Amino acid sequence: MSSIVVVGTQWGDEGKGKITDFLAEQADVIARFSGGNNAGHTIQFGGETYKLHLVPSGIFYKDKLAVIGNGVVVDPVALLKELDGLNERGISTDNLRISNRAQVILPYHLAQDEYEERRRGDNKIGTTKKGIGPAYVDKAQRIGIRMADLLEKETFERRLKENIEYKNACFKGMFNETCPTFDEIFDEYYAAGQRLKDYVTDTAKILDDANVADEKVLFEGAQGVMLDIDHGTYPFVTSSNPVAGNVTVGTGVGPTSVSKVIGVCKSYTSRVGDGPFPTELFDEDGHHIREVGREYGTTTGRPRRVGWFDSVVLRHSRRVSGITDLSINSIDVLTGLDTVKICTAYELDGEKITEYPANLDQLRRCKPIFEELPGWTEDITGCRSLDELPENARNYLERISELCGVHISIFSVGPDREQTNLLEQLW
């Protein structure tokens, strides 16, 4: 099996969906391995724009399988809404497969997410309140309900009653709140499970069959390395592992199955939610990037925080995710700026450091050390090769590659498919 993993190298929203869709043309199977409907990606297909949250990008290709792996947490009601929306626009979803081992998000997870953020007050993490974290907590506590359980009426009824009793005790003690009732959950979610039943299967077997048949598998990451619960800006992170290594756990394939890891980044940096962001901009350059780049969350609609490109972040991501190739998006957004900056290192308490600190208090004290390069004013949205880029834009990309220690295989100068440029064959 030839396989490629696509991961975000920053704090999510790097354009992974677009790159996944671009690479999916040559794949046989496209599989998601982590996260839930807190992730949002925008796809241009057939001249139309689609915003997906749970459904893999491969859904648009009838001859390819789109797989939701066991590492994904699934809100069945939200998933059905997404599938219905695609069907209404003429997109078939018959090629979707959902792992029978995927955890189910239920209304008490959504309630718990809301209560937890309220309890934290000024120390809130800034979650999307989609129930992702609480669902992963239940998984670790071994009380989670999986897709296989949801489909069996007696099993779902028994497990749901047990969990509601437990959640009520927790909610009363911690939040002085009550859990959604059995009657408020059971009928709706059991019916949702029955509607999804034909999609649910052992997806690890599908991927193993693809391996045996020497098919091409594309693993689609969610969020980004800096939101990884182990390797990101903890605790301002997601509740799963977006790093490439989680492909093995989140889909059931072996580690030897991965051929390449494509790290996707923007030509600048963005972040949604709270947490440290060393290169964040609050000036006119930041306003330019946010408005030209349309930096508003796909899932939340919240304005994203934006900043200069941070090579300290990228080097960290390269190391912990084994990135072999770089895909740089949104280069066109920087057009018109007099100068562009790259963070090459941090200053921490008067000393220069080149590695990303694990300690949050240290990270907050870090000051970015910038290298300044001349900008460009030429319209680059029609460029199809590095040689066609203005010299200053080309020098900017080459400097990023040099600082991060990864060669560039893809660059993008706009949102459309034809504005994504492949510099070398990846499959």
Curated annotation (Swiss-Prot):
InterPro entries: Adenylosuccin_syn_GTP-bd, Adenylosuccin_syn_Lys_AS, Adenylosuccinate_synth_dom1, Adenylosuccinate_synth_dom2, Adenylosuccinate_synth_dom3, Adenylosuccinate_synthetase, P-loop_NTPase. It catalyses: IMP + L-aspartate + GTP = N(6)-(1,2-dicarboxyethyl)-AMP + GDP + phosphate + 2 H(+). It is found in: Cytoplasm. GO terms for biological process: 'de novo' AMP biosynthetic process; IMP metabolic process. Its cofactor is Mg(2+). Belongs to the adenylosuccinate synthetase family. This is Adenylosuccinate synthetase. It comes from Staphylococcus epidermidis (strain ATCC 12228 / FDA PCI 1200).
